[in-house]
Curated annotation (Swiss-Prot):
PTM-bearing positions, type Phosphoserine: 19
Region (Necessary for association with the pre-rRNP complexes): 1-41
Name by which UniProt lists this protein: Peptidyl-prolyl cis-trans isomerase NIMA-interacting 4
SUPFAM superfamilies the UniProt entry points to: FKBP-like
Species this chain originates from: Mus musculus (Mouse)
Encoding gene (name): Pin4
Amino acid sequence: MPPKGKSGSGKGGKGGAASGSDSADKKSQGPKGGGNAVKVRHILCEKHGKIMEAMEKLKSGMRFSEVATQYSEDKARQGGDLGWMTRGSMVGPFQEAAFALPVSGMDKPVFTDPPVKTKFGYHIIMVEGRK
């Protein structure tokens, strides 16, 4: 499959946030994840101990959305669903992790382990889609 967006002219009009802004091109080394947007869920905890409790629940087979609802301190408690996020709209470590993860589903989630540390706290991230 050929790489997308090499000159910026092949962008579709659907992705409102991404269209017209070529600022994402400044990181033209292109992380191996590919695509310009990911559908992301996360669990955010300020304290390391709490995020590790959440990690244990995930590893024991509890659904990602349930763990997010129970543990995440993010204001938007929709099972951790952040929706579609474009390159440049996330903080550095979160973005790197999100674009490095494979797409997975609730039945067999692939998530960041260990959690990712940002200025907001600790995140467990999973990716449900890529475009």
